């Protein structure tokens, strides 16, 4: 039996185990997906222990996505983004690290047949999710503006991306009025504060594509108001699904059973 898992703190409410175990069942893989909660002080021990115990691969979540860079060999995307969320072990060798959050953003748009190349995109939030989203959109050809309460953090991302990326504060009326894509990469609107929204409804407009990284609730206030404004909406579960899809494909070198993974994920969200 192969063992995969998730390292983070906390991880007790993670939706990854049912999603990945549905994939193993669908592909006839004898595997389990388990969770681990190390501390920052025991992270290196946890990574080395997983490697020594022949664990096949692990996902990494908050607060360790940056810290694990010190213990693995990152691929080019993970190195550019400065964060790892997927690790693959290789027979005791130094583990390889990947950032599938970037691919998760791209494939969420692809799933909905939405082109990114040449579009103007606004990313709200300059944390880890915002950084991955901004890099994903820029890599796919979008002109990206990062908006954040602390402008310096947004400016850092824009500088790292280079090209035409720009940055500013949270007053994004002008940027969103000209934008084709809006992506919320903050936790604003997440349960139990689902009455909140990161962007005033008056900023939203027909022709805009709005992706909210928040997936509890599935339909956030931002998405409801975007629909009312005539925008196209994508819920955050699609990002979660596709980062898991890409992780599965890295680990197993098989095509992921996307339908079964999506069904398991959304069943868990309905029960949450």
Curated annotation (Swiss-Prot):
Reactions this protein catalyses: shikimate + NADP(+) = 3-dehydroshikimate + NADPH + H(+)
Catalytic residues (positions): 65
Gene3D superfamilies (UniProt xref): Leucine Dehydrogenase, chain A, domain 1, NAD(P)-binding Rossmann-like Domain
Catalytic class of the enzyme: oxidoreductase
One Pfam family, short name: Shikimate_DH
GO terms assigned for molecular function: NADP binding; shikimate 3-dehydrogenase (NADP+) activity
Protein family (similarity comment): Belongs to the shikimate dehydrogenase family.
Organism in which the protein naturally occurs: Haloquadratum walsbyi (strain DSM 16790 / HBSQ001)
Stated role: Involved in the biosynthesis of the chorismate, which leads to the biosynthesis of aromatic amino acids. Catalyzes the reversible NADPH linked reduction of 3-dehydroshikimate (DHSA) to yield shikimate (SA).
Disulphide connectivity of cysteines: none
CDD domains attached to this UniProt entry: NAD_bind_Shikimate_DH
Keywords, ordered alphabetically: Amino-acid biosynthesis, Aromatic amino acid biosynthesis, NADP, Oxidoreductase
Residues annotated as binding NADP(+): 76, 125-129, 148-153, 213, 236
Protein name: Shikimate dehydrogenase (NADP(+))
InterPro entries in the record: Aminoacid_DH-like_N_sf, NAD(P)-bd_dom_sf, SDH_C, Shikimate_DH, Shikimate_DH-bd_N, Shikimate_DH_fam, Shikm_DH/Glu-tRNA_Rdtase
Subunit structure comment from the entry: Homodimer.
Binding site for shikimate: 14-16, 61, 85, 101, 215
EC number: 1.1.1.25
């Amino acid at each position: 039996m192969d063992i995969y898992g998730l390292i983070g703190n906390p991880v007790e409410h993670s939706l990854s185990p049912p999603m990945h175990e549905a994939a193993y069942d669908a592909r006839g893989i004898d595997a389990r997906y388990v969770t681990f909660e190390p501390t920052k002080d025991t992270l290196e021990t946890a990574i080395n222990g997983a490697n020594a115990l022949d664990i096949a691969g692990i996902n990494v979540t908050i607060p360790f996505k940056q810290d694990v860079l010190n213990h693995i060999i990152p691929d080019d995307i993970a190195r550019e983004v400065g964060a790892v969320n997927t690790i693959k072990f290789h027979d005791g060798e130094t583990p390889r690290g990947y950032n599938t959050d970037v691919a998760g953003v791209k494939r969420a748009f692809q799933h909905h047949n939405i082109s990114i190349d040449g579009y103007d995109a606004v990313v709200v939030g300059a944390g880890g999710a915002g950084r991955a989203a901004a890099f994903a959109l820029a890599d796919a050809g979008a002109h990206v503006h990062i908006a954040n309460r602390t402008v310096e953090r947004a400016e850092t991302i824009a500088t790292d991306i280079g090209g035409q990326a720009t940055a500013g504060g949270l007053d994004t009326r002008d940027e969103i009025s000209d934008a084709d894509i809006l992506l919320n990469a903050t936790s604003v609107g997440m349960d139990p504060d689902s009455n909140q929204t990161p962007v005033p409804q008056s900023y939203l407009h027909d022709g805009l594509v709005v992706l909210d990284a928040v997936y509890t609730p599935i339909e956030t206030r931002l998405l409801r108001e975007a629909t009312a404004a005539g925008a196209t909406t994508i819920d955050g579960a699609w990002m979660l699904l596709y980062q898991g899809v890409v992780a599965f494909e890295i680990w197993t070198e098989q095509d992921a059973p996307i339908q079964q993974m999506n069904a398991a994920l959304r069943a868990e969200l309905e029960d949450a």
